[in-house]
Amino acid sequence: MDFENLFSKPPNPALGKKPAADPEERIDEIDGTEVEETQTEKVKWKVKRDREQIPKKFKHLGNAATSPKSLLRKKSRSKDYDPYSDGETCSQGSEDNFDKELQQYIQAKEMANAAQPSLLPEESVKKAGAEGTQQTAKQKNKKSKAGHKKVKQKKMKRKWPGTGDKGSRALLKNSGSREQTDEPEEKQPRVRMSQGFINQHTVERKGKQVCKYFLERKCIKGDQCKFDHDAEIEKKKEMCKYYVQGYCTKGENCLYLHSEYPCKFYHTGTKCYQGDHCNFSHAPLTAETQELLAKVLDTDKKSCK
């Protein structure tokens, strides 16, 4: 019975319905399908058995989709492969080709390494260090050149005495003579200052222009100051407010009065409870201390009002 024609072509409606088949014919059709199924199962079993008989080497090297029937056909075409078995032909040929390719690869790699030898790690480190030292040397040379240029410019600005425009020979002679005699160089003359500048930064004491910043203990130039520091520093006629509170850090260098200030309790006739341990003076009053005491009493009267 043709199954393809039965399922592919639909029934023609013009012809009408076919008469129902007899039960005997239907039994024959069922028997035929069972026979075909058993035959297909036998064929599948034979194919599976043939695959199990093929060696593992051949399975790995060959294509998995090829069936043993196609392999047998290829084998039967050539007579040269008759005396050899399947496993021997495949394994020997593949192993020989692999060994040859491996040897060729090793030889090519050795030739390349011999032609272009790679640097050792020590040599590479030395090379990197040499490059770094070259860069640092270049930077130092640039800095030294810039410094030499500045020194030359300064030397050109200076004029040695007696040289004039005679050139470099006169400079060399003068420098040689100075080195031989070891005479001290003359001090550079002080810069001339205007009278207004002097009056702004000095105070006249005993016919001298004394640095006013020195008198205030604020001069930061010290011995390099252009004005005189030869004077006694007079303290201001005021009481140090930090001394009264007990934490003046300047001590004797403070510009304000500390223990020299007169004690208002002792000099007004009241009892000073501090006694000899008083932080202010119990000495006899002078003209200056009398003025200071009067100022203190005036401030107290104003505060009481």
UniProtKB/Swiss-Prot annotation:
Entry-linked SUPFAM superfamilies: CCCH zinc finger
Domain of life: Eukaryota
Phosphoserine PTM positions: S67, S85, S91
Annotated localization: Nucleus
This protein's GO CC annotations: Cajal body; euchromatin; histone locus body; nucleus; transcription elongation factor complex
GO MF terms, alphabetically ordered: DNA-binding transcription repressor activity, RNA polymerase II-specific; RNA binding; RNA polymerase II intronic transcription regulatory region sequence-specific DNA binding; zinc ion binding
Positions carrying Phosphothreonine: T33
Swiss-Prot/TrEMBL keywords: Apoptosis, Isopeptide bond, Metal-binding, Nucleus, Phosphoprotein, Repeat, Repressor, RNA-binding, Transcription, Transcription regulation, Ubl conjugation, Zinc, Zinc-finger
Tissue expr: Highly expressed in heart, muscle, testis, kidney, brain, liver, lung and spleen.
One Gene Ontology term from the biological process aspect of the record: negative regulation of DNA-templated transcription
Zinc finger (C3H1-type): 205-232, 234-261, 262-285
Cross-link named Glycyl lysine isopeptide (Lys-Gly) (interchain with G-Cter in SUMO2), sites: K44
Ranges of Basic and acidic residues composition bias in the record: 39-55
Biased composition (Basic residues): 139-160
Segments of this protein annotated with the region Disordered: 1-191
One Pfam family hit: zf-CCCH_9
Ranges of compositional bias, category Acidic residues: 25-38
Subunit details: Component of the little elongation complex (LEC), at least composed of ELL (ELL, ELL2 or ELL3), ZC3H8, ICE1 and ICE2. Interacts with ICE1 (via C-terminus domain).
Described purpose of this protein according to its UniProt entry: Component of the little elongation complex (LEC), a complex required to regulate small nuclear RNA (snRNA) gene transcription by RNA polymerase II and III. Acts as a transcriptional repressor of the GATA3 promoter. Induces thymocyte apoptosis when overexpressed, which may indicate a role in regulation of thymocyte homeostasis. Sequence-specific DNA-binding factor that binds to the 5'-AGGTCTC-3' sequence within the negative cis-acting element intronic regulatory region (IRR) of the GATA3 gene.
Free-text comment on this protein's domains from its UniProt entry: The N-terminal region and all three C3H1-type zinc fingers are necessary to induce transcriptional repression.
Protein name: Zinc finger CCCH domain-containing protein 8
Organism this protein belongs to: Mus musculus
